[in-house]
Amino acid sequence: MKPEDFRADAKRPLTGEEYLKSLQDGREIYIYGERVKDVTTHPAFRNAAASIAQMYDALHKPDMQDTLCWGTDTGSGGYTHKFFRVAKSADDLRQQRDAIAEWSRLSYGWMGRTPDYKAAFGCALGANPAFYGQFEQNARNWYTRIQETGLYFNHAIVNPPIDRHKPADEVKDVYIKLEKETDAGIIVSGAKVVATNSALTHYNMIGFGSAQVMGENPDFALMFVAPMDAEGVKLISRASYEMVAGATGSPYDYPLSSRFDENDAILVMDHVLIPWENVLIYRDFDRCRRWTMEGGFARMYPLQACVRLAVKLDFITALLKKSLECTGTHEFRGVQADLGEVVAWRNMFWALSDSMCSEATPWVNGAYLPDHAALQTYRVMAPMAYAKIKNIIERNVTSGLIYLPSSARDLNNPQIDQYLAKYVRGSNGMDHVERIKILKLMWDAIGSEFGGRHELYEINYSGSQDEVRLQCLRQAQSSGNMDKMMAMVDRCMSEYDQHGWTVPHLHNNTDINMLDKLLK
């Protein structure tokens, strides 16, 4: 069965229950040396799956529908999440921004690869299907399916960190390549990284990132959609923070790890048949190379990414304030200044999301794209911001992050709880249970394995740091902004020379220059 076949009503997206059922398809997921029978019930994945299901359920709640949903443009007569339909104006983008934010608040910004992330790919297919040449109709069909059902896509576009100094066609034993062409489709083998949360998705888009060297063998120049239950598709998962949290603690100890862990996995394809209707680019280096700049996804996904980070920083800012109140340092001038800096970082990303929408630019077929300069700024600044904010938290909360008991179980032991009540209480009348709860939440956010992974995630979210900054420079050059800035400097320098001012409205200093008088 296809995911859309689980819907009781074809005019609406999946519900949470239908989403969970659609994952029970025999997909080949491995963790801790064993194959997972059902990701919706396995302790390594079940709470993350339930958290995504909650997002699907929100699409059908009357009090959230106005913010989250609007009608489809496919002729189905149904409705969908706003970011699953192509924006046709700046106001459409603003409404999409608000829908993204509302959905993200369900995970407090801690789930990044939610269904709306790759909805940007679906919209790119729908807005510019002609880019895919002979596979134009495939692009149109996928846009319709993604939009009407709310299909959960991920992508795997980065090659494994093996021999990256070589072109793809010189690492044939590792990177995904064409094995064989058949009447039914293409057969592919190889691996990709990192397939974040793919264990809980319906499909993976396989392609190339912008910073990778492709080589000359067209058997590597592919882009296609792989169902997660396709024979030969395998995910080898990293350790599950959710499962570790459940096995060694409780929600009180690990309130984020235990429900929002988007497991990153090694994606292996072992002679996988990809039907022709799932192929988007086939043995076409030129189109693969142009996809990043012309395909549209790279211009669309940063809106979701920026808004999701802004929501996350709302949460972190408030949690930092609570943590400082625990320790009694929240009124110190220097501490308040650091908290103010975190607020400024938070404000910047909300402002960038505003700019992406208000300065939106027309694209093809009536579609609108987020402002390019704003999204490039987000991509450059986000890694800097996250690392700086984490450092501010560590410098200001200090030992409060680890001056904590091992587990909620300690609170149930009267022999030690009496000491915890006295020596681990909060400031200004806060009891020890509340203080420990707040600071364990902060530790899970930045200090646990889950928290450390999130720092790595935010720093590398948009790919190579050099490439991200180079793209920002290229955008300034291609848009003409660099020429305008250069022209301003040239105009300034043209207004004077070694003899004085060259413009008529300024007065030369020959009448007051002391050196002229002294050296006569």
Give the residues covered by each predicted segment.
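N-terminal-proximal low-complexity accessory segments that begin disordered
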Residues: 3-58
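Generic structural signal for well-ordered, non-transmembrane alpha-helical segments
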Residues: 46, 50, 144-147, 311-314, ...
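Internal helix-loop-helix
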Residues: 57-153, 203
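FAD-binding core of flavoproteins
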Residues: 155-308, 475-519
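Short, charged, amphipathic alpha-helical segments
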Residues: 336-340, 368-376
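Alpha-helix capping/hinge segments and adjacent helical runs
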Residues: 373-516
